[in-house]
């Protein structure tokens, strides 16, 4: 269940709550008291002062309460996504000081003890600041610590000697030696909760997980596992490890009583524990109101929920006295006779017919899509009028200005659609269609509408894709690349068409993408997908070379076989040139001369000098001629006689 509250934290006493919400397209930081001033159940004290961030690109990534020893005042440390750490004074409602890390990497988490402030950024660098002198003391990196999300200080007297950091796994860092001392078993998803509950134990939880692991800092063993009924969002403990309260994703609150005390008598008992108490808040009409944060201290429990979308309300409970399943019934509409005690955003106008309720106002990043349908209908009317104009025959000057490419494109369109169109109408139609696709794409990305996004991505015209991305806002190009990476990773058969969108996003908005800090973490899915696919390129090229080599060998063999077959008819033509005279054979003039002549022809094929050599021929009765000259004379005589 998504909450309008992006960040929230109670002060150490539980009397104030700091929370971060969104007003239009900018974040704002507010602080509200948690105690009721009257017995009527209405919070009469309301702080209307908010710290509005100047730029819509600035985001608060983490926050901590701090008691400044130099001025003896309470302040709030805000970690920003631009690499700065702001010191926000609640009383003055202004930022009194800004720490800087020297780069623009996002601050992931902060923790402080005494006058020391520790933080980590998205480049996995550690920073130590002095809150008295307001300066940076040191910064360093550790090789084995990457993709860090959470940081907490392990108390050791008044000094800080060790740190706990977590990504998917948890590591214990020695500050002096700057190395990993111990590694604890981690979670499948990134760690979102990391707190030290005593000097010997700490607790950790992950995103989208309903399990909390309690570890022994010194031995590294798992003490117990706390199991909630739903995914855990926020955690609060009493400081003595006798009670832990968690808010879950379904809007309930669960309390674990004495989580470190083993109730099993077996030596190898089950280490998992379920919650002892569960609290829910419902309205009088039966609707469930989600709890987004809570603070537990000894016997007192303070729960907070939202009304009118962004207005926090609080209630104190004696949690030890309530039953295991407890439901708090509240009224969402207060009938207050004292209008000065009204908890609406800016009070109520008695002369107004209806009162403004902020929860009914839906604003998404300052863009109003209310008139998108009307705009699309107007564009469709324009397209209809353009098609009517295109049906008219073109003028003479238009025909003269058309190039060969224009005529070719017009003929192609006419062949497909069966209508003749000129270049002017075609360009106007394409431009209007591109504008419509851009509006639909922007709406789909901002509203996270996957079905609407699929209708846009089904477009295969590269020119329309290029013009659409050219008109797209650079900030939305990052979201588009993330959506494309998800589809390429899941649907490999769509990689070709989707690569066209990725290509033009990188070409057109590449300059903006380079200026974004933490680009690797933002587009990590796209980077891993493309890298995994590009790793196959050398193997595919090697396979292509082998296939080319094999095909060339087959072509060579076929060519040689063709030459052999083509040479056979030539030999037959040479044999056809030999004349056979039947009359000479019948007259008995040729007995063995023909054979001698045939043998001479065979020997002449081997060498030009074989005409002068002697040769013998066998007769049918097996006798051999002793003198070759007689045979040659007979052969010559037969030729002369023939002439």
Curated annotation (Swiss-Prot):
Bias-annotated ranges (Acidic residues): 570-611, 627-643
Stored InterPro entries: SSU_processome_Utp12, U3_snoRNA-assoc_WDR, WD40/YVTN_repeat-like_dom_sf, WD40_repeat_dom_sf
Residues in WD repeats: 14-54, 55-98, 186-225, 227-266, 340-389, 471-511
Region of interest called Disordered, as start-end residue ranges on this chain: 565-643
Protein's cellular compartments: Nucleus, Nucleolus
Gene3D superfamilies xref list: YVTN repeat-like/Quinoprotein amine dehydrogenase
Coiled-coil regions listed in the entry: none
Function of the protein: Involved in nucleolar processing of pre-18S ribosomal RNA. Required for optimal pre-ribosomal RNA transcription by RNA polymerase I together with a subset of U3 proteins required for transcription (t-UTPs).
This protein's name: U3 small nucleolar RNA-associated protein 5
Biological source species: Saccharomyces cerevisiae (strain ATCC 204508 / S288c)
Upper classification of the organism: Eukaryota, Fungi, Dikarya, Ascomycota, Saccharomycotina
Name of the gene encoding the protein in the UniProt record: UTP5
